[in-house]
Amino acid sequence: MLSLVQKIIGSRNERFIKKVSRIVQKINSLEPEFEKLSDEQLKAKTFEYRERLANGEILDNLLPEAFATVREAGKRTKNMRHYDVQLIGGIVLHQGKVAEMRTGEGKTLVATLPAYLNALTGDGVHVITVNDYLAKRDAELMSDIYEFLGMSVGVIVADLNPQQRKEAYACDITYGTNNEFGFDYLRDNMAYEKEQQVQRSRNYVIIDEVDSILIDEARTPLIISGASDDSSEMYNLFNRLVPYLEKQEKEEVENEQEQRDFYVDEKSKNAYLTEKGYAKIENMLKKEGILEEDDNLYSPHNITKMHYLNACLRAHSLYQLNIDYIVRDQEIVIIDESTGRAMPGRRWSDGLHQAIEAKEGVKINAENQTMASITFQNFFKLYNKIAGMTGTADTEAFELHSIYGLEVIIIPTNKPMIRKDHHDEIYGSVREKFDAIVEDIKERISKGQPVLVGTASIEASEVLSTLLKKKKIRHNVLNAKQHEKEASIIAMAGYPGNVTIATNMAGRGTDIILGGNLEVEIAQLEDPTPEDIAQIKAEWLKRNEAVKKAGGLCIIGSERHDSRRIDNQLRGRAARQGDPGESKFYLSMDDNLLRIFASQSMAERVKKGLKGGESLAFGFMSKVISKAQGKVESYHFDIRKNLLEYDNVVNTQRKVIYEQRQSFLEAEDVSDILADIRIDVAEQLFHDYVPAGSMHELWDLEGLEKALKSDFMIELDLQKLYQEDDSLGEEDLKKLVREAIEIEFVEKTKNLDSGAVRQFEKFSLLQSLDTHWREHLSSIDHLRNSINLRGYAQKDPKNEYKKEAFELFSTMLDNFKYEVISSLAKIRIATEEETQRAQQEWQESMSDIKAEHESVIDNNQRHDEDEQEETPKVQQVRREGPKVKRNDPCPCGSGKKYKQCHGKVE
């Protein structure tokens, strides 16, 4: 029924394309008029549009003329004319949607249309790419168009200093990576002077490879952190002990003889000790002198030991060299599971990275304390309008819409796509599969057809490379180990008979041109003459035609990825802009996707039915594979959705803190803010000792006097005052306390330079807020890590998390207010020079902070899905009863007052 309706009225996508085609016709009708304009007249259009906006006209009304202006500027500066389908893509992006455009359809040029239009407002436009190379390349390629029209262009890359960043953000259009934009946002919210902040408003963002950034990267938060205590000895110890543990093949075993020390869950990348394993590791720790004879790992004080043990167990049993990571320059470098790229600077959390460092025998870096963090999901939601481009978004359309409110529109290709997609071939073993791939490659290159082989891991690419070398087949390898050669390898990938092996081609960002990249060849010539260029072009045309006759670029996939989208990205490298091309995937029943997610009975039947070297290639198996991929995609979507629900709690708190902090930073004078805080603190302190509406017998005036003296340097004999006048009520005493705190501050500052006082007050506010926020993030991390254990008490972990996170936040705000007023009361107010020196010292003390796109994919999976984890990673003392007063004994049992123990601010 649905298909019948769609045939009659067309799909939603078709109706949208038909609707915007009318706008395209309007733009096309303006082309002859704009062609007649002189350069000066065309440039003047920018000023005209800005004036019209200032007079109340809206961007939608300006769109046809603005797009016609950019198209004409492209023709004059780059000899590039925007196709009609590119105009459609530009309209989609302006409307805050995702444009799915096939590889080679010119997404970089498309972005100039909405970027120019939205930059007319003066609020800036951000264009996000997946790496620094693409950010620089795209900005340089398109800067001629923008600058011709009077628009400034900036680029944010990793090695810029703060002043250069500020200048780049001040430009009309700023290119950069998602990491750099996100980290600059976090750093701006750690600045101590307004002038140190580099970003301005987050108005409109265009995200290239939007599916990669908003979906693949969604589970990996940006984290700014500082080093915590060194624990390398413990990691080295457990790294030495874990190899003695034996792996159990499955979770449940039929008899005790089959029981081993641990088992793994490959779906969630977790490893679990059995009871036998616990006993074995306990005995080893006792022999090492780490555990006492009567001690056990279940004791609360051994929680940290379990942390090291679990991290090392996972490092040894689940993470493999050259698949999950590589060792480069004596450092562990994570490999992105989606793109195959090495990601220097990114670290796994929860001690996993340190465990792998111990495993590989490199220096163990200290675990880090989070100082600021945000997920891409919540960072990009800060923009007024989001748009995205990609070659493969349709399979993720539901997630993009449900989480980000982004509609996916499939843009028609400029020329018909004529790629031939062959059925998958499935073999019984990995070796048989690789042998078949080598034979296929040999046959194709014999007729001059270039081949791109996509692999899922470095290990697979190196195995295949070894087999090709044995057959004396020349080839290039592109993986995380050869990333420096990427551009030159891709430039040659379309040569007749060339073979290129690439680990996960997703996000490579460079088109493979049949016959080779002509522009690269010309650029490599030194002072070429017109004759040299003409000869190069003629040779390229011959090669281009030869490759087309051979069938175009052939894509061979060595296995299916977990995500159909990644497979489609690999396929999409062939048959660009109407060129011929082919694609084919080779699989084995030992591939991870089929081994983990296909049923065991299915795998056994297929293996039995295949004799040595035989393969299956029919539609039924394609359905099995598609179903397995659907399971994985659904599984990962649930993880991302779950993570977002948890992170939204912290995100709400982050917004409150950052807005409050920004108001402190922008205020010339924070004395009114402090006056309000002093009132809150006086109220808080008073009711800690005099419960609201209570009888006199419950008042602790002596405790209140001691707190005033120790925390605020105030001598106030409340007991004497009450004895002299027992008509004094609760409100009267509260007023006395409030006035005493206010008078003390006025007396302390009345003879000091007001400028120095104001500067010191602002510094104290910012420093105290940062300290408390950092400690709060640590508490939230601990809460998040252990909250799933609430399931044992028949409580919903998510609701418990929201409730307790709110309580922690409220307590943090109370403590912040109390400590900042207490500190100002006890500290001598510094001179302006001393304050500046203190600010400098504080910032120098934070100079070791690291900006990391911390890979918590697998660790968050563990927290989100494993409701049955037996041992919490941390133990946190948490209030179950009435609020603990600052002078009460700390609930942890240390014997100290709460304010000097867990209520203390370092």
From Swiss-Prot:
Catalytic activity reported:
ATP + H2O + cellular proteinSide 1 = ADP + phosphate + cellular proteinSide 2
**Region feature (Disordered):** 853-906
Q: Which domain of life is it from?
A: Bacteria
Would you name any one GO CC term?
A: cell envelope Sec protein transport complex
Return the InterPro entries for the record. Helicase_ATP-bd (IPR014001), Helicase_C-like (IPR001650), P-loop_NTPase (IPR027417), SEC_C_motif (IPR004027), SecA (IPR000185), SecA_CS (IPR020937), SecA_DEAD (IPR011115), SecA_motor_DEAD (IPR014018)
Instruction: Give the cofactor binding note.
Output: May bind 1 zinc ion per subunit.
Q: Give start-end positions of Basic residues composition bias.
A: 896-906
Instruction: State the EC number(s).
Output: 7.4.2.8
Q: What ranges does the record list as Basic and acidic residues composition bias?
A: 853-865, 877-888
> Which class of enzymes does this protein belong to?
translocase
Q: SUPFAM superfamilies this protein is in?
A: Helical scaffold and wing domains of SecA (SSF81886), P-loop containing nucleoside triphosphate hydrolases (SSF52540), Pre-protein crosslinking domain of SecA (SSF81767)
Which residues bind ATP per the record? Q86, G104, E105, G106, K107, T108, D511
**Which SMART domains does this chain map to?**
SecA_DEAD, SecA_PP_bind
Sites where the protein binds Zn(2+): C890, C892, C901, H902
Q: What does this protein do?
A: Part of the Sec protein translocase complex. Interacts with the SecYEG preprotein conducting channel. Has a central role in coupling the hydrolysis of ATP to the transfer of proteins into and across the cell membrane, serving both as a receptor for the preprotein-SecB complex and as an ATP-driven molecular motor driving the stepwise translocation of polypeptide chains across the membrane.
Family stated for the protein in its record? Belongs to the SecA family.
- Give the protein name, as stated in the record: Protein translocase subunit SecA
